[in-house]
Amino acid sequence: MNKVPMTLAGYESLKEELRWRQQEERPRIIEAIAEARAHGDLSENAEYHAAKEAQSLNEGRISELEDLIARAEVIDVTKLSGDTVKFGATVVLVDEDTEEEKTYQIVGDQEADVKSGRISISSPIARALIGKGVGDLIEVNAPGGARGYEVLRVQYG
């Protein structure tokens, strides 16, 4: 069973989604199925079929969440320190071409959200950053071509 690294915040988010799906969404869907079933003929009952599909999707996600939570390797980034980049680090970079600063936190695959500044540990930029420190230069082969960055800051917590 492969462990799935994630931050404490990511782990708590998955647990909250699981709780919501089991305790709120599941009963709502069961009620919708019962209501649609009461309308009679199920063969042409669009509400019934939509509710059954929603149930299938919800149960699939519940199974996925249970698996992720069981395999979670929770890393409390508030207890990490150091001046090199590793899982959980928040890194400030400067693009060598545009001189634009970017800030990213390196997180697990399930909690990555580039718009929020959280990048997956398995992303090209995170892989290039692991083990680097302030002042180091990295080159990332991205879909738009190679980009160069300099590490300005490495923070934890």
Swiss-Prot record:
GO terms for biological process: DNA-templated transcription elongation; regulation of DNA-templated transcription elongation. It comes from the Bacteria. The keyword Ribosomal protein does not apply. One of its GO terms (molecular function) is DNA binding. Keywords: DNA-binding, Transcription, Transcription regulation. InterPro entries: GreA/GreB_C_sf, TF_GreA/GreB_CS, Tscrpt_elong_fac_GreA, Tscrpt_elong_fac_GreA/B, Tscrpt_elong_fac_GreA/B_C, Tscrpt_elong_fac_GreA/B_fam, Tscrpt_elong_fac_GreA/B_N, Tscrpt_elong_fac_GreA/B_N_sf. HAMAP family: GreA_GreB. Belongs to the GreA/GreB family. Necessary for efficient RNA polymerase transcription elongation past template-encoded arresting sites. The arresting sites in DNA have the property of trapping a certain fraction of elongating RNA polymerases that pass through, resulting in locked ternary complexes. Cleavage of the nascent transcript by cleavage factors such as GreA or GreB allows the resumption of elongation from the new 3'terminus. GreA releases sequences of 2 to 3 nucleotides. This is Transcription elongation factor GreA.
